[in-house]
């Protein structure tokens, strides 16, 4: 959530920043809400002052032996008016908060203008796509030929956009996960975390999925309001909800491996073949909690950690700076990493790394205690390090051989019992 003071006092600056997203707020509406809020707050405070003065007057009259019944009757009426004014003020503040929760984060000044992915800016490329001297297969054909990737079985078990991995491919996915976690925890300084795969609505409000994106979530039926996590970002970032952290503890850095569950609402007909777009997929997520002045440098570091995984695996990729119109709801700046997929002859997203600024922290009331003993909002960051299923398909396609076997990248061989290939 963006700073309410900006909405109250500088809506023009908010709209100027949101223009990069193609979003504009109605200044008249927000001015009207602020006028009503001030009127109700002033009325409430005035009535409270009148009640306090009346109580003092009653005490003086009774002390003098006089009759204070008339004033006491008026005070009772004032009490009823105060209750009504407080209810009206609370309802208005709830309305303002709900409207504020639907406003996306303000893009950083360095974010380019643009409407969609066509306006994103390529920052760099790493690696050279392999030139094959045989007719290549996509990962779906490779997996089915090996007998280790089954979509029909998953459809029978659950439905479309699910998959079953068996044998060497299942082991390769586990190897990728272990390699990612080992790299982030042993080399990059993250603390490993395993978290619940079900979260409550407060957690999803904290990270920004609710209330705006409920249709993208899987919600459980029953008495308790639980949702399947769309990413480990949700539970891990909420570690600091309603907390005040000592400054010397920052930054906090966590890495978590979880399945992720997404309804993929609005993606009907897109990427229906293979592992690109699934309702359930594994991901290793990185989360950092930092001081405000450190967050932009932390974004570069976190993105570099995701790049390091791709480089260690020898997978060609490119780094993209997202334009305002393509950024996620809660982000102030985002880099996407796109891996080369030979069968599609293009790059596809494999990691998204975002600085959320204080947007999530304000929703969560996540603060830290400064050296001056004041409390300020932390900044939060998150990034995929990496999406495991998409990394698996990238390894399968980029490391395939003419005989259908798949070479095992050197860094994964210790996790594969020394195997140099699988078939």
From Swiss-Prot:
Free-text note regarding domains: Consists of two distinct domains, a catalytic core and a N-terminal extension that is involved in tRNA binding.
Entry EC no(s): 6.1.1.11
Single GO MF annotation: ATP binding
Oligomeric form and interacting partners: Homodimer. The tRNA molecule binds across the dimer.
Protein name: Serine--tRNA ligase
Enzyme class: ligase
Pfam families per the UniProt record, alphabetical: Seryl_tRNA_N, tRNA-synt_2b
Keyword Glycosyltransferase: no
Positions contributing to L-serine binding: 231-233, 285, 384
Catalytic activity from the UniProt record: tRNA(Ser) + L-serine + ATP = L-seryl-tRNA(Ser) + AMP + diphosphate + H(+); tRNA(Sec) + L-serine + ATP = L-seryl-tRNA(Sec) + AMP + diphosphate + H(+)
GO terms (BP aspect): selenocysteine biosynthetic process; seryl-tRNA aminoacylation
One of the record's GO cellular component terms: cytoplasm
NCBIfam families noted in UniProt: serS
Subcellular location: Cytoplasm
Residues where ATP binds: 262-264, 349-352
SUPFAM superfamilies registered for this protein in UniProt: Class II aaRS and biotin synthetases (SSF55681), tRNA-binding arm (SSF46589)
Coiled coil is among the record's keywords: no
CDD domains reported in the protein's UniProt record: SerRS_core
Family the entry assigns: Belongs to the class-II aminoacyl-tRNA synthetase family. Type-1 seryl-tRNA synthetase subfamily.
Pathway(s) per entry: Aminoacyl-tRNA biosynthesis; selenocysteinyl-tRNA(Sec) biosynthesis; L-seryl-tRNA(Sec) from L-serine and tRNA(Sec): step 1/1
Keyword set, alphabetical order: Aminoacyl-tRNA synthetase, ATP-binding, Cytoplasm, Ligase, Nucleotide-binding, Protein biosynthesis
Superkingdom of origin organism: Bacteria
Protein's gene: serS
Its job: Catalyzes the attachment of serine to tRNA(Ser). Is also able to aminoacylate tRNA(Sec) with serine, to form the misacylated tRNA L-seryl-tRNA(Sec), which will be further converted into selenocysteinyl-tRNA(Sec).
């Amino acid at each position: 959530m963006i700073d309410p003071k900006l909405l109250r006092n500088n809506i023009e600056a908010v709209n100027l920043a949101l223009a990069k997203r193609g979003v504009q707020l109605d200044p008249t509406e927000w001015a009207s809400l602020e006028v009503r809020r001030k009127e109700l707050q002033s009325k409430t405070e005035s009535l409270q002052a009148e009640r306090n003065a009346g109580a003092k007057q009653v005490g003086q009259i009774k002390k003098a032996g006089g009759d204070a019944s008339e004033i006491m009757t008026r005070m009772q009426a004032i009490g009823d008016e105060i209750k009504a004014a407080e209810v009206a003020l609370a309802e208005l503040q709830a309305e303002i908060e709900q409207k504020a929760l639907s406003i996306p984060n303000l893009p950083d000044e360095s974010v380019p203008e643009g409407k969609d992915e066509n306006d994103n800016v390529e920052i760099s490329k790493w690696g050279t796509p392999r030139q094959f001297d045989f007719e290549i297969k996509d990962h779906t054909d490779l997996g089915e030929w090996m007998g280790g990737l089954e979509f029909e079985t998953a459809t029978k078990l659950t439905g479309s956009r699910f998959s079953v991995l068996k044998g060497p491919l299942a082991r390769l996915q586990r190897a990728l996960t272990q390699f990612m976690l080992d790299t982030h925890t042993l080399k990059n300084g993250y603390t490993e975390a395993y978290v619940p795969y079900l979260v409550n609505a407060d957690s999803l409000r904290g990270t920004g999925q609710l209330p705006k994106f409920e249709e993208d979530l899987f919600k459980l039926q029953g008495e308790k309001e639980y949702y399947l996590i769309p990413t480990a970002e949700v539970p891990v970032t909420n570690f600091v909800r309603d907390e005040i952290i000592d400054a010397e503890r920052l930054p906090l850095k966590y890495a978590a491996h979880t399945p992720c569950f997404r309804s993929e609402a609005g993606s009907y007909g897109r990427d229906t073949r293979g592992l690109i777009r699934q309702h359930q997929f594994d991901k290793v997520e990185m989360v950092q909690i930092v001081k405000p002045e450190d967050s932009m440098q932390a974004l570069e570091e976190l993105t570099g950690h995701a790049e390091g995984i791709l480089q260690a695996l020898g997978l060609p990729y490119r780094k993209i700076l997202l334009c305002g119109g393509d950024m996620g709801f809660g982000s102030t700046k985002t880099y996407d990493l796109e891996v080369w997929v030979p069968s599609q002859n293009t790059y596809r997203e494999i990691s998204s790394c975002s600085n959320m600024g204080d947007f999530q922290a304000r929703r969560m009331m996540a603060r830290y205690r400064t050296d001056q003993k004041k409390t300020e909002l932390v900044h939060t960051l998150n990034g995929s390090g990496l999406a495991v299923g998409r990394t698996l398909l990238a390894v399968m396609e980029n490391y395939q051989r003419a005989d259908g076997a798949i070479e095992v990248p050197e860094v994964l061989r210790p996790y594969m019992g020394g195997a140099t290939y699988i078939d």
